[in-house]
Regions:
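Active-site/catalytic core of tyrosine-dependent DNA strand-transfer enzymes
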Residues: 59, 125-168
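Conserved tyrosine-mediated DNA breakage-rejoining catalytic core shared by Y-recombinases
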Residues: 37-43, 58, 85, 94-134
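Short, polar N-cap/turn motifs at the start of nucleic acid-interacting alpha helices
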Residues: 99-106, 168, 189-198
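Hydrophobic recognition helices of helix-based DNA-binding modules
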Residues: 17-25, 132-135, 184, 188
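Short, contiguous acidic/charged loop-to-helix segments that flank catalytic cores in large enzymes
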Residues: 48-51, 67-70, 111-119, 144-149, ...
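C-terminal catalytic core of tyrosine-transesterase DNA break-rejoin enzymes
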Residues: 80, 84-91, 157-160, 164, ...
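Short basic/aromatic active-site micro-motif
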Residues: 12, 73-76, 151-152, 168-188
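Basic, Lys/Arg- and aromatic-enriched nucleic-acid-binding interface segment
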Residues: 3-7, 11-16, 26, 30-89, ...
Length: 198
């Protein structure tokens, strides 16, 4: 709220920048990754509170779980979209079809974030679009995801799915936001847009 980014957000940005340079090295665009030349003091550090995030492989396992109920499936798909976009659970619970607009030929989520009151404009790549459920009607006020109301119940479904996936990390729905930056390069997400919601 003071205009500064959280320590963990800065760490995720550093990891994302490092991934960009690693990709540039692999494609022989640059000779070495300049992030590796930073001293320990110059690098960002994780905050004391440990926050879990999923690797791409773990997220794939989570999303490939065969869900037993419609509520479980809805949480699974919403988690996938949050992992691609960084959208908070509170915003996902209130996301309406009218919030998804076609801008320059690209399906884009345009919302005012409930927590920060700041606007966020997030273009959706093909992977993100795959998490959207079939639209039931033409009403722009209709919810995209019919998620259960209580966050505790959503956490219950997340734990159930992750146990089925054989993932030992103790993570919650909020962990999807910590996964976003680590997926940004591999998923083709627009980093400047992701920054808006992180």
């Amino acid at each position: 709220q003071d205009g500064k980014l959280a320590d963990y957000t800065l760490l995720l940005f550093e990891e994302t920048v490092k991934a960009i340079f690693n990709k540039a090295v692999r494609e022989e665009l640059i000779a070495f990754n300049p992030v590796h030349s930073l001293t320990k003091v110059e690098r960002f550090h994780a905050p004391d509170k440990h926050r879990e995030y999923l690797t791409p492989e773990e997220l794939t396992r989570f999303l490939n779980v065969e869900c037993a109920t419609e509520n479980e499936r809805t949480v699974q798909m919403a988690f996938g979209l949050s992992s691609m976009t960084g959208i908070r659970l509170g915003d996902m619970q209130h996301l309406r079809w009218g919030d998804i607009k076609l801008i320059d030929g690209v399906q884009t989520i345009c919302i005012i974030q409930r927590k920060t009151k700041r606007p966020a404009t997030i273009p959706l790549n093909d992977m993100a679009l795959s998490f959207l459920p079939p639209r039931e009607d033409d009403n722009p006020e209709s919810l995209v995801f019919h998620l259960v109301k209580k966050s505790d119940n959503i956490s219950k479904y997340v734990r159930r799915i992750k146990d089925k996936a054989g993932i030992e990390k103790d993570f919650t729905y909020h962990s999807s936001r910590h996964t976003t930056a680590t997926l940004a390069i591999s998923a083709g997400a627009d980093i400047s847009s992701v920054k808006e919601v992180l």
